[in-house]
């Protein structure tokens, strides 16, 4: 058997390391600061979230919707709002069991990667809060002015796209799946393609469908906290 070159711990973010959905929470936050209509935006935000949970989300449509306010407000206002979002919403949602899980893999010498279907604008500072440098998130295309234009750059890291993006991540390091021993923590059946790919899938705070599947397949189940 070929020896592995590295051990890699992969973490989904929303409802896995966080008890909230950061993408949805950011949308709610934009209504509280007056960037979006609280009724119309909330309705569409909830509709997109329902599609995500059902596995029917069109991520391109969603990202256009989700980053529209950021695009319109411009860089300086968006970065200032994100800093406030981190302080008011994300920081109170950080939980010791999740921080300890990441730290345990760090102390074991594992490479740490957050792999999320939420966009990089929202998730980069969250990854930093967990002390994780490697972030595989939905990358946002930039317009001629160097600011977000509402489109996705490259392959979105959702569903099967998480496998593709991780393969790109590995290839950039001259590695393949055979070269690494991967553990992946996720709460959602949407992540089944990547859970199936890794050596050690861990159903973490799993939704009902993933919990049932994990029991059927004998996968480890980890409950870090109650979802909100």
Where is each model-derived feature located?
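Acidic/polar active-site rim loop that often engages polyanionic ligands
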Residues: 23-26, 62-63, 144-151
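Electropositive phosphate-/nucleotide-binding environments in soluble metabolic enzymes
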Residues: 20, 42, 56, 60, ...
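A general alpha-helix detector
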Residues: 25-26, 47, 61-65, 81-85
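Catalytic cores of transferase enzymes with a strong primary signal for eukaryotic protein kinases
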Residues: 13, 76-79
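Short, compositionally biased "basic patch" segments
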Residues: 48-75, 139-144
